[in-house]
From Swiss-Prot:
Gene Ontology biological process terms from the UniProt entry: L-histidine biosynthetic process
Recorded family membership: Belongs to the imidazoleglycerol-phosphate dehydratase family.
Principal subcellular localization: cytoplasm
Keyword Disulfide bond among record annotations: no
Taxonomic source organism: Thermotoga petrophila (strain ATCC BAA-488 / DSM 13995 / JCM 10881 / RKU-1)
Any single Gene Ontology cellular-component annotation: cytoplasm
Matches recorded under Gene3D superfamilies: Imidazole glycerol phosphate dehydratase, domain 1
Protein name in the entry: Imidazoleglycerol-phosphate dehydratase
Keyword Flavoprotein belongs to the record: no
Listed GO MF terms: imidazoleglycerol-phosphate dehydratase activity
Signal peptide: none
């Protein structure tokens, strides 16, 4: 994996026996450019970008073994590393939270840019796929992102039956929580460092 810093962004390239990914994460555009080849995953990524205010350009996203699990997980790894490289967690608010309704679904997201990776959600999906994306991809993406961004993320589903609505409500709340955590603040940590 290689990382290249830009003025307002980071390029991450990841090439394994399973996938080849090249992405740029920036603080300027606030939208997704390009495609992962998985339409619903693209929809979730664009949702995250819109609500977080971050820009994501996908230059390359190819599966060498045809297994979506690997592609989605490795995309999360790449994006998480880009996020970690782009932001200094000691210079932002650090904590963020948001709760977002979408029709019958209501999901909250709670974020800590702590330097300590942890992911938890209190819901499971009731179907195997949402559109063209295996539902296990949601958790694989989030775990890849969280572990390499080194942040804590909790999702709490208050209500919801439709898996499309639940996943989109979750991603909207994640984007908003990240945006709030990235705001400037004088209060970061009582121990003086984030590691």
């Amino acid at each position: 994996m290689t990382v290249e810093r830009l003025e307002n962004g980071v390029i991450v390239q990841r090439n394994t026996n399973e996938i080849e990914i090249s992405i740029t994460l920036d603080t300027v555009h606030g939208k997704l450019e390009g495609s992962t080849g998985v339409n619903f995953f693209d929809h979730l990524l664009n949702t995250f970008c819109h609500y977080s205010g971050l820009g994501l350009r996908v230059s390359t996203c190819e599966s060498k073994d045809g297994i979506l699990h690997h592609l989605i997980e490795d995309f999360g790894i790449s994006l998480g590393l880009a996020f970690r490289e782009l932001f200094d967690y000691t210079k932002v608010r650090r904590f963020g939270e948001a709760t977002v309704p979408m029709n019958e679904a209501l999901v909250g997201c709670y974020v800590d840019l702590s330097g300590r990776p942890f992911f938890q959600k209190n819901f499971e999906f009731s179907v195997e796929k949402i559109e063209d994306m295996p539902v296990e991809g949601f958790e694989e993406f989030m775990c890849g992102f969280v572990n390499h961004a080194r942040i804590t993320v909790h999702f709490f589903k208050f209500f919801g039956k439709n898996d499309h609505h639940i996943s989109e409500s979750a991603m909207k709340s994640f984007g908003l929580a990240i945006a709030r955590a990235l705001e400037g603040s004088e209060k970061k940590t009582t121990k003086g460092v984030i590691d």
